[in-house]
Amino acid sequence: ARGVLGARLFDLVTQNRRDGRLGFEDLVIAKSLYEKGTRDEIEEFVYQLIDTNGDGIVDRSDLESVLLVIFESVFSHEDSVSASSSLPDMVNVFLGASTFAKDNGTDAEKCLSFEEFKSWSALVPSVRKFLGSLLTPPTKARSGFQVPQLVHDKNISDDGLLLKKEFAWHIGGALSSNELEEWKLLYHSTTSGLSFNTFLGSVANDEGPTLLIIKDGEGCIYGGYASQPWERHADFYGDMKSFLFQLYPKASLYKPTGANNNLQWCAVNFSSDSIPNGIGFGGRINHFGMFISANFDQGHTFACTTFGSPCLSKTSRMVPEVIECWRVVHRSPQQEKQEGVKGSVLERFKEDRNMLNMVGIANSSN
């Protein structure tokens, strides 16, 4: 961890002694709490971690400092933050879903309570994953650090994409590591036109999960993760892996609540008003969580219990301006298995073994 986040983590691990010394016992205690504690204990540790001043108050400036460190750490080997967005702008996007309602007893701005932190971190799981993995080995698949490679034709520049690397990292917070290797652009309305038939043709040969992303006429960007292929159905289909997300002007993610199974919608060439032609997610017929008509010229987003999501756009009725669809390329089970069994058992558990060696029990026969 870098900067203020690294300094704060050091203070917490050394139990705030402020003597500049880190003992092995400090590390063992911290890791047992940070990685093996109860859910509430881990959340409390992370909440203390984002209190960068250690004053018991988590305000907006604390979160701004934390997010700056996160972005610098995650994207240090990338092309920095996307050219179309400055770092402060991206920080504001990720703070958009936070609520500072707690009175800190002074005339200063409101602060973030522990419960408000838990609510916010559920909406930005990539941030929570990063903060929860700072004491783990810095591997390629380190939780919270993975950014998928975005593959697209050269006739579309990075600046012309709705899906920026920071947004991909945000969405990836809800996915497994084997889904964060590569995402391939299948359809972009700027080059293919706003055409439902072209869209369906572009995604027809890809059976894996996809990301549908929309920028509407008001400038809002949002979408959904479709776990199942886009195929003709007369009713809702899909599974509980699907979710909705917002990317701009605020970043948030909404997973299924279990309230119903109205997850994914794809109706093509039906003549009944009760089966609206188009694609969407959640809610109910004609009152979807997100929906684009088959003409790709209009749609709507309503608050829905399927994902516990609010209206994703500024108003419930929206006009799509740009539509993208990305294929989430899965790493094969064989590849994952091969990577998982490299080396001997002792080599694979080298970190734990080193810790045991330090306390003299790794080679004990008892």
Predicted regions and their residues:
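Phosphate-recognition beta-domain surfaces
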Residues: A1, G6-A7, D11, I29, ...
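EF-hand Ca2+-binding helix-loop-helix modules
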Residues: A1-I50, R60
